[in-house]
Amino acid sequence: RVRSSAASDVYKRQVYVLPDKAIGKQACPVVYLLHGYGGNARSWVQLKPELPQMADEKGIIFVCPDGKNSWYWDSPENPAYRYETFVTSELVKYTDGNYATIPDRKARAISGLSMGGHGALWSAIRHKDVFGAAGSMSGGVDIRPFPQNWEMNKQLGEFAANKASWDAHTVVNQLDKIVNGDLALIIDCGEADFFLEVNKDLHNRLLARKIDHDFITRPGGHTGTYWNNSIDYHVLFFDKFFKK
């Protein structure tokens, strides 16, 4: 458990998946995995039961926080929901202070699915001093086409009356904060996913800014089967980044 002043609960439950190396106090890199809307801290280990085996094989610590339905923002409408601060500051400091990590952005990555894909890119782009690599699986990287969905209006206010806030809280409008080389990026989305078009738009915006990134589309939808496959690509990408 992590004591948090940024999130409404005094304690936020997290799930830590530790490789044997870390249990033996040998310092390891860390991948933060963010769940989607309706999920919780256990979502990733339920979706990918092989996560402990992957941790051992790669020598990576996986940290799976409970982000509720926050979209990982510091909500301008809900002062109790400061999940950007929680994930990028409090949780990272707690993890580095209590586990055998390599406390450096070059050994720290973040990824997630759906809401968590948005959250991972949002967190990394805005805190490139904290994370060296980031990924998104089926991420809601432009929220504006979906103004009535997934309780986003609880965090940002109703879209019609708060368009400027919605513009400011969408990933595709954060790209001015990075230049090529700031982050190692991997983005993927299924060909049958309702987020496919916003992910293609993000890809094109990154190309226009000449920001290197891996962009993958594969057959599949917005499903656990797709993400169970996606995580393998992301862990491979992050492992290569950590070993540079």
List PLM regions with ranges.
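Short substrate-entry loop that stabilizes the transition state in hydrolases
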Residues: 23-28, 33-72
